[in-house]
């Protein structure tokens, strides 16, 4: 579902299509890749672009201005790359492998209330490669904070959070990959939910979500922000120990 926070725009006198003038664009990158560049195209030949090597979880405040767009149907093309793979390629004096992605976005007519240059079309890039549009009159609006999740994880678990002594950037990207997986598999977005997902996946058991009691929690808390995190924190030490020792082939035994 595409999110539009407002309801009606100015319309072209020669058609009923909405027209957005003097619009800035910013991207919020929730993928596990660095977002190098993006282009938004409407069906009338207009385009807007931005990017600038946005690391996972970043984008707020990075605005490109000013553009005109028209209509309700758009195509978004963007380039991403894996920062860990890129570093190896740089060390080997090779070109960085860039991945091109494309998505189509439908946005109902949206009212733009700010003055020219104050309106921002926020593009939310999700881990499953779908994109959502949202008009804003500020430079905020991030829906997933990987940085806060990783800061909590590193502060709370110390050496256990980074047992192989990766540098901060690599350790952060590892956290991001797991958190992004939590979104793709279960739609988790809140800090509480992602904190617990990362902890259990990286420290307790990478397949913890296949444990019957955890699967029950995932079903019962679906669509309820923070509920998964709260439920996982309440598990007894004995249950956590069982999850740590759990193997998927034992599932039927555990149920019995």
Can you say where each PLM-predicted feature lies in the sequence?
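Bacterial signal peptide processing site
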Residues: 12-14
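Tryptophan-paired
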Residues: 40-85
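Short, ordered, surface-exposed loop/turn motifs in non-cytosolic proteins
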Residues: 32-42
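Solvent-exposed loop and beta-edge segments used for protein-protein assembly and interaction
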Residues: 19, 32, 68-70, 97-99, ...
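Beta-strand-rich cores of mature extracytoplasmic or soluble domains
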Residues: 84-256
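Sec-dependent N-terminal signal peptides
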Residues: 1-5
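Structural motif
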Residues: 23-33
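C-terminal motif of bacterial Sec signal peptides marking the signal peptidase cleavage site
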Residues: 6-10
